[in-house]
Swiss-Prot record:
It catalyses: sn-glycerol 3-phosphate + NAD(+) = dihydroxyacetone phosphate + NADH + H(+); sn-glycerol 3-phosphate + NADP(+) = dihydroxyacetone phosphate + NADPH + H(+). SUPFAM superfamilies: 6-phosphogluconate dehydrogenase C-terminal domain-like, NAD(P)-binding Rossmann-fold domains. This is Glycerol-3-phosphate dehydrogenase [NAD(P)+]. The active site is at residue 192. NADPH binds at residues 15-16, 110, 141, 256, 282.
Length: 332
């Protein structure tokens, strides 16, 4: 493929944003990787690698780090946002006066914005019905950077943008599958991090493999209830953005959310566990957002509710498990 005429801007230089930047730059595309932290950008520019969040993977010549948001967006049509969900709205607001009508917005952020809003709703409110896309699926940043085989889902509201973005990203080692269910993909990405905390807690308490499998399976049911209420497709649940990402995040210790849950299950204080991770723990923030959404729409999500009580009401993890085990039996 010939490199695209215009550079692509990636807003967010954490591990996942950097991994996606590497995928694009290795295909010869010009990539501008933006971070709001000037000292971090200085390091990346001097060292040619993101030693803070994704060390050992040198930047190709076409990948440049930026701190000036305006400069990073100049002459750019396609923007890929990869910041924590709690910062998503702020980034959209900051870039709003710097873009034009031709801009197309994609994101690799997984979660809900403040007020339990889906991210495409935030984009539509601030920017109108621009071409949008969300990328999600089982994709550990270190494995993507190491060029290990990975498959993700890309859902969009615009067929041309979907086609172009898949062409930008897709390769033998990074396979991108088209999807038209933005709602389902976004909600799956929000809930799976909460369930990863739950399975981490279970494993930290040494409850065994049977319990882990049960949590993943019943968690998928909770995910399905939420997706159904908001008009998402049930097929998304068994795809890469649903079951695929859920299994990976709940079982691999590279998952920050799982490691956070493990620490809580082992009796580590919440604040100490959070500090030990070193990067954003999406499930910690999104438990509150998903919990509020479930309460508002009367959706039964017992695992999510117990994780919320552990994180925000100081419920002891052992007690949370006991209460789940004491629930009345129901039809599967």
């Amino acid at each position: 493929m010939e490199p695209f005429k215009h550079p692509i801007a990636i807003l967010g230089a954490g591990s996942w944003g950097t991994a996606l930047a590497l995928v694009l730059a290795r295909k010869g595309q010009k990539v501008r990787l933006w971070s709001y932290e000037s000292d971090h950008v200085d390091e990346m520019q001097a060292e040619g690698v993101n030693n803070r969040y994704l060390p050992n993977y040198p930047f190709p010549e076409t990948l440049k780090a930026y701190c000036d948001l305006k400069a990073s967006l100049e002459g750019v049509t396609d923007i890929l946002i990869v910041v924590p969900s709690f910062a998503f709205h702020e980034v959209i607001t900051r870039m709003k006066p710097l873009i034009d009508a031709k801009t197309r917005i994609a994101w690799g952020t997984k979660g809900l914005a403040k007020g339990s809003r889906l991210l495409h709703e935030v984009v539509a409110t601030e920017l109108g019905q621009v071409p949008m896309a969300v990328i999600s699926g089982p994709s550990l940043a270190t494995e993507v950077a190491a060029n290990l085989p990975t498959a993700v889902s890309l859902a969009s509201n615009n067929s041309q943008f979907s086609k172009d973005l898949i062409e930008r990203l897709h390769g033998q080692r990074f396979r991108v599958y088209k999807n038209d269910d933005m709602i389902g993909v976004e909600l799956c990405g929000s809930v799976k991090n909460i369930l990863a905390i739950a399975t981490g807690i279970s494993d930290g308490l040494k409850l065994g493999s049977n319990a882990r499998a049960a949590l993943i399976t019943r968690g998928l049911t909770e995910m399905g209830r939420l997706v159904s209420v908001f008009g998402g497709k049930q097929e998304t649940l068994t795809g890469l953005a649903g079951l695929g990402d859920l299994v990976l995040t709940c079982t691999d210790n590279q998952s920050r959310n799982r490691r956070f849950g493990l620490a809580l299950g082992e009796g580590v204080d919440k604040k100490e566990a959070q500090q030990s991770i070193g990067q954003a723990i999406e499930g910690l923030y999104n438990t509150d957002q998903v919990h509020a959404l479930a309460q508002k729409h009367a959706i039964e999500m017992p695992l999510t509710f117990q994780v919320h009580r552990i994180l925000h009401e100081d419920l002891d993890p052992q007690q949370a498990v006991q209460e789940l085990l004491e629930r009345s039996p129901k039809a599967e």
